[in-house]
Regions:
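A structural signal for short, well-ordered beta-strand segments
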Residues: 43, 85-87, 123, 148, ...
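Short amphipathic alpha-helical segments
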Residues: 99, 103-107, 120, 128, ...
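Short basic/hydrophobic patches in alpha-helices and adjacent helix-turn junctions
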Residues: 107-118, 134-135, 150
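C-terminal polymerase-core module
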Residues: 34-39, 45, 128-141
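Activity-critical C-terminal alpha-helical subdomain
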Residues: 130-165
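C-terminal substrate-recognition/cap domain of FAD-linked oxidoreductases
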Residues: 1-100, 104-107, 111, 115
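Alpha-helix capping/hinge segments and adjacent helical runs
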Residues: 113-125, 154-158
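Short proline/glycine- and acidic-rich turn/helix-capping motifs at secondary-structure junctions
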Residues: 12-25, 120-135
């Protein structure tokens, strides 16, 4: 058991290649297993490790004000600051859980901006997160990203107009 600032209650490190493979199989099935606990809203975020604890504390408090009793099923590869922040509908929830998604997303996105995180960790922005991308990045950041994309894709053939118009 490893605890750092009360952030981790339990941590296991693979001791062999086989154990690492077993962990990976477990991880691959985790989100599907979580869905058995109720309706799931999933967020693929990244946040600096130094801000992780305060992000979790604030987001849990604020989101619980919207959906009391919501379940937080969080896992990820913290070494690169990537978190699968999965929120599960509370037991006996009255109403449509998915109607709360936009309010929850606003809280998460504003905290990610405040703590220098990102709305997308390993899965990219894509069409689904395009609006959130523009809401959470400054004009300066977007200009720099466009310049980098243009450097590697001067003919704009890769994902044309998927993120940058």
């Amino acid at each position: 058991m490893i605890s750092h600032n009360n952030l981790f209650e339990d941590l296991i490190i693979a001791q062999s290649i086989q154990e690492g493979n077993n962990f990976w199989q477990f991880r691959e099935k985790l989100t599907e297993a979580q869905k058995l606990d109720g309706k799931l809203l999933g967020f693929d975020i990244s946040i600096p490790l130094s801000s992780l604890e305060i992000f979790f504390q604030k987001s849990k408090f604020l989101i619980n004000n919207i959906v009391p009793g919501i379940k937080f099923h969080t896992f990820g590869h913290l070494g690169d600051s990537n978190i699968h922040y999965n929120l599960i509908e509370p037991d006996n929830f009255k109403g449509n859980f998915f109607d709360c998604e936009n309010d929850i997303k606003k809280i998460i996105n504003s905290l990610l901006v405040e703590y220098h995180g990102s709305i997308s960790a390993e899965h990219g922005i894509g069409i689904l997160k395009k609006d959130d991308f523009y809401k959470t990045k400054s004009k300066e950041e977007i200009i720099i990203m466009k310049k980098i994309k243009n450097l590697f894709d001067p003919n704009n053939i890769l994902n044309n107009k998927k993120i940058f118009d």
